Amino acid sequence: MAKDTALHLPLGLESVGWVLGLLTTSILYLFLSPRSQIPRPPVVNKYWWDFFQIKAKRDFDARAEDLIKLGLSKARAKNTERRFGPRLVLSDKLADAVGMDNRFDQNKGIAPVNLVELRGFESMFSAALHDSVPRPATSATSKRLVHLTQPFSEETTDFLQREWTESPDWHEIVVYPVMSRLTAQVLSRAFVGPKLCRDARWLDIATTYVSHRMTAAVAVQKWGTVLQPIVHWFLPSCRRLRAHIQRARELIQPELDRIKENPLEDETFTSLAWIHGFAQGYIYDAGLAQLRLTAVANHTTSDMVTKILIRICENPELIQPLRDEAIEAVRGGRLRVAALQKMFLMESVMKESQRLEPFFLLSMFRYATETVILPGGTAIPQGTLLTVANPSRLDPAIYPDPEKFDGYRFVRMREDPENAHLAPFTKTNPTNLNFGHGKQACPGRFIAVNQIKIALCHILLKYDVELVEECPSQLIRSGLLTVRNPGAKIRVRRRQEEVSL
């Protein structure tokens, strides 16, 4: 039986998620056509006296996961629909059907709340290439990982030498901002090349653009739809966002001019050069294109590697086995894709952390371009905005003792013929929707797994690490977001690595 639910989604920074397009959320109702024969779904956190959804917003911020579970548990019949804000929430049992059906459009699923029609929010291509670039550009980057592995390793070395230092004495670092800067520098090597990836001005943009855009979006969405095209010109956060974008354009332009002057020059791949060739003369905004790629990749990957590193520090018995695995994989040569692919324990630790600490509680945001009848009889009316919950990630029938962190869980799963297909970090399936699923699954997941493995290899082989227990590092849940305490710290000190990276 299909299960789906509905919730009022609060409007606020704490409940804004960013998935493949800097997705912001709204509490606007989406009414079905009067001619629809499908009954309008009830709402889980709706109160008859709550005319302005104030109670609904507070409920959602405080216990979004519980409300999603409640709604899914109350789905009674195959045609039942429930909706939060403008989103219909489906169970992951329908992830295969939604993910493989072309009638569910991803771009239209996020466009209504992206504010792309407002100046400063249009972090997409313009004209004929609108919406068409991020996926192929990311896929093109993924296909060149064999050639990008060593550059990624070089940037990791450069960053750690500067930021973590070569000191053999223990010293503390605040995890998230440091890992965000590391991720920005490494990924920017693939996006904008070796010069800009170490430019402090570009790295400042890469690490702050998402938060600036989120803040501006929240400010705009406090106003009615009719007023938004006017008020955004005067809101300080929106003016700051536009200035931020202009600085990015100014930094990108000299590098783009160099590419135009030497189109046949044999050089390391960058998405900046690839997109210029892909455009084939069409007018586009190179700065916005890079911000789109950088923001999406940096924000989610930084969050992921922060959580993984803290998990490792919370389970120090994993450190030496992870080191041993890395030493064995790298022995006899530098870091290469083939070596990274042998690190099954590291991948298991990464996936287990991701399973327990998803950045976003919902996935697969879609728009129904026509009425669709899903398996089991669930009817999705044309024009419905929907998303998929992921209760299977905590299903004890799939993951024994599901609330417990088990770094070896997916190592054992690889050895089980029936479940081996669930083990790889980049494999999408209904039991783990962190990268989406189906035809429009995140193409950047292959880049993320390599970048994170490279970072962990350098960190674990070159440094001793331990958690600063006096500083809070617990998970913080707010709305749909699950993040580590931003003040979480670790202690590090330089050690002599057993093999050269």
From Swiss-Prot:
Give the primary localization class. membrane
Q: Which residues are glycosylated?
A: 298
Q: How does it sit in the membrane?
A: Single-pass membrane protein
Protein name stated in the entry: Cytochrome P450 monooxygenase notH
Cellular component, GO annotation: membrane
Question: Which gene is annotated as encoding this protein in its UniProt record?
Answer: notH
Q: Which cofactor does it need?
A: heme
| Bilayer-spanning residue ranges | 11-31
Entry EC no(s): 1.-.-.-
Q: What's the top EC group for this one?
A: oxidoreductase
Q: Where located?
A: Membrane
A Pfam family cross-referenced in the UniProt record is p450
Pathways per UniProt: Alkaloid biosynthesis
